[in-house]
């Protein structure tokens, strides 16, 4: 990326650029010696588009919607988008299945893949489980470990149903391993709902 003159130092704080496309404040700014900074990659005019195997066609104009984005953080760590683009290519990953909360960031990874002459894998973005307030279920909303539930099998069956997989009635008497084996054998990607989120029952993410 540096050989292509696509990188430049950025001294902006997160607070000053949060919630809006980066305007290029530091694009033509002279480097400041001995000052902590992140590294941004220049984006280009035009749209990045791909067809998600679940959500369908997705298109984004990086320059207008995102702006130049960070590929190396001020603390010296490489940013997620660059790390996964390179790591997936190194491992020969051909298919990526993940939550729909990462759908909008995918064009940034594809852009880096293109600039680095890496193969772009196929993407499938599943709807994420959320609370009734559209908060992603996680430790932050007191989500409970599946295996800590009184009947974890019910959660697995419930999840399969919400993902459009139509679990067999016989699974009500199955154990966790048997349910997962059924899911692997009968998984049908075309039946997964084309939506970004699915509201989960409150007992699955709150202890009280």
What are these language model-derived features?
Residues 2-3, 161:
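Alpha-helix boundary recognition
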Residues 3, 9-148, 167, 194, ...:
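Active-site cores that bind ATP or allylic diphosphates and position pyrophosphate for catalysis
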Residues 146-150, 155-208:
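Polyanion-binding catalytic cores of nucleic-acid enzymes and NTP/SAM-utilizing transferases
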